[in-house]
Amino acid sequence: SYKTPIEQIKAKNPKGIIFTGGPRSVYLDDSPRMANEIFELGVPIFGICYGAQFMVYGLGGTIGKANENAAAEFGRTECEFDTTCPVFDGLKKNSVVWMSHNDYIEVLPEGFKAVGHSDKCPYAAIENVEKGFYATQFHPEVNHTEQGFDMLGNFLYKVCHCKGDWTMKNYAEEAIKQIRAKVGDGKV
């Protein structure tokens, strides 16, 4: 959650962080925000739609207001990707994604480059390899985005180096171990 204190996030020692999308604008006072310290944790971050705009704005880039002539896109949109970017590694160079935004990335922060674009959106996907920061103006998490789950998987496994070996059995064993440690010889 955007409301999670930075100390709590540090304590969890995350392998990566994903900023989700939403209908807000970074210029509104009541928009979800985190302390900019989040960018100094040394862990990979993936921003989705509003999350991408939040990242860009927080790191010194500029967010513009979309209109019929400037990057307004809603629905299925054809994008072209740089497949040397780890997020798009092994994927098709051209793909349909789901766009839904009123604001757009106008100027990139220092160290970022475009790794995906559409006809109206020059920064449909961006990266800062040195920091491990990636972002998409579109929504890879929805079914309408072709290869979207593969993009998220690439972030988790190729960028964050997560293992993907979680099972319900492992969870149950770990939960039982933690409960026993708390309860001791007591009855549960």
Residues of each region from the PLM?
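RNA-binding accessory domains that recognize and position tRNA/RNA substrates
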Residues: 1-19, 23-29, 33-44, 53, ...
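Conserved G/P- and acidic residue-centered "switch" motifs that form tight phosphate/ATP-binding loops
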Residues: 49
